[in-house]
Amino acid sequence: MSLLTEVETYVLSIVPSGPLKAEIAQRLEDVFAGKNTDLEALMEWLKTRPILSPLTKGILGFVFTLTVPSERGLQRRRFVQNALNGNGDPNNMDRAVKLYRKLKREITFHGAKEIALSYSAGALASCMGLIYNRMGAVTTEVAFGLVCATCEQIADSQHRSHRQMVATTNPLIRHENRMVLASTTAKAMEQMAGSSEQAAEAMEIASQARQMVQAMRAIGTHPSSSAGLKDDLLENLQTYQKRMGVQVQRFK
């Protein structure tokens, strides 16, 4: 796996799924391929994206700034600086300075990542802030190691939170989660079916499923009524899998 592929993988792991994730992936690919060289326009686009947390925007802004060649005097962006200040916690800043001193002696991506993984996400973000604000300089490889370690820390906590939700025994949360998954699956299938002339029936099934979820939410239903909802939807859509040329199993 190449260095840039690894960076793209880690960064995308902290971006919520949806159309915006596909857009960000495309921009990262363009930046890494040297196709997008307008850093100012890129940062303005990033600043106005909805859904993304300030920290995710800060990390993406840091990656774009590292990768896109720019004039030395180009202004640093406030939204990135604010995201990478470690929540203003002096402890984070102290740890970030210690980490920076270690990274300064490191030259490899993997070496930097290993060192950084023993620090908290707050300290890692503060260290990125030091480098972004030109208070410290490290090689691009080392900076990317720092980025990937930060993303790994964030993705780990997101995964723990997701696992807790999936494992919950609370019937109301399970019920709502099944309806959200069914609705999301239907929406994705509608988008994919849109490019196929023969997928009108699949579109209809997906649309009916979404209407059913809306109705269940509107009238309030028993927590067990959503059991199997997503699986039923997938079974129906399976019929049109060959016509649509889509691997529906991936949604399971």
UniProtKB/Swiss-Prot annotation:
<dbReference type="InterPro" id="IPR013188">
    <property type="entry name" value="Flu_matrix_M1_C"/>
</dbReference>
<keyword id="KW-0946">Virion</keyword>
<comment type="subunit">
    <text>Homodimer and homomultimer. Interacts with NEP. Binds ribonucleocapsid by both interacting with genomic RNA and NP protein. May interact with HA and NA. Cannot bind NP without genomic RNA.</text>
</comment>
<dbReference type="InterPro" id="IPR037533">
    <property type="entry name" value="INFV_M1"/>
</dbReference>
<dbReference type="GO" id="GO:0042025">
    <property type="term" value="C:host cell nucleus"/>
</dbReference>
<dbReference type="GO" id="GO:0016020">
    <property type="term" value="C:membrane"/>
</dbReference>
<comment type="similarity">
    <text>Belongs to the influenza viruses Matrix protein M1 family.</text>
</comment>
<dbReference type="Pfam" id="PF08289">
    <property type="entry name" value="Flu_M1_C"/>
</dbReference>
<keyword id="KW-0472">Membrane</keyword>
<keyword id="KW-1048">Host nucleus</keyword>
<feature type="short sequence motif" description="Nuclear localization signal">
    <location>
        <begin position="101"/>
        <end position="105"/>
    </location>
</feature>
<dbReference type="InterPro" id="IPR036039">
    <property type="entry name" value="Flu_matrix_M1"/>
</dbReference>
<feature type="region of interest" description="RNP-binding">
    <location>
        <begin position="165"/>
        <end position="252"/>
    </location>
</feature>
<dbReference type="InterPro" id="IPR001561">
    <property type="entry name" value="Flu_matrix_M1_N"/>
</dbReference>
<keyword id="KW-0694">RNA-binding</keyword>
<keyword id="KW-0468">Viral matrix protein</keyword>
<dbReference type="GO" id="GO:0039660">
    <property type="term" value="F:structural constituent of virion"/>
</dbReference>
<feature type="region of interest" description="Membrane-binding">
    <location>
        <begin position="1"/>
        <end position="164"/>
    </location>
</feature>
<dbReference type="InterPro" id="IPR015799">
    <property type="entry name" value="Flu_matrix_M1_N_sub2"/>
</dbReference>
<dbReference type="GO" id="GO:0046761">
    <property type="term" value="P:viral budding from plasma membrane"/>
</dbReference>
<protein>
    <recommendedName>
        <fullName>Matrix protein 1</fullName>
    </recommendedName>
</protein>
<comment type="function">
    <text>Determines the virion's shape: spherical or filamentous. Clinical isolates of influenza are characterized by the presence of significant proportion of filamentous virions, whereas after multiple passage on eggs or cell culture, virions have only spherical morphology. Filamentous virions are thought to be important to infect neighboring cells, and spherical virions more suited to spread through aerosol between hosts organisms.</text>
</comment>
<dbReference type="GO" id="GO:0055036">
    <property type="term" value="C:virion membrane"/>
</dbReference>
<dbReference type="Pfam" id="PF00598">
    <property type="entry name" value="Flu_M1"/>
</dbReference>
<comment type="function">
    <text>Plays critical roles in virus replication, from virus entry and uncoating to assembly and budding of the virus particle. M1 binding to ribonucleocapsids (RNPs) in nucleus seems to inhibit viral transcription. Interaction of viral NEP with M1-RNP is thought to promote nuclear export of the complex, which is targeted to the virion assembly site at the apical plasma membrane in polarized epithelial cells. Interactions with NA and HA may bring M1, a non-raft-associated protein, into lipid rafts. Forms a continuous shell on the inner side of the lipid bilayer in virion, where it binds the RNP.</text>
</comment>
<dbReference type="InterPro" id="IPR015423">
    <property type="entry name" value="Flu_matrix_M1_N_sub1"/>
</dbReference>
<dbReference type="GO" id="GO:0003723">
    <property type="term" value="F:RNA binding"/>
</dbReference>
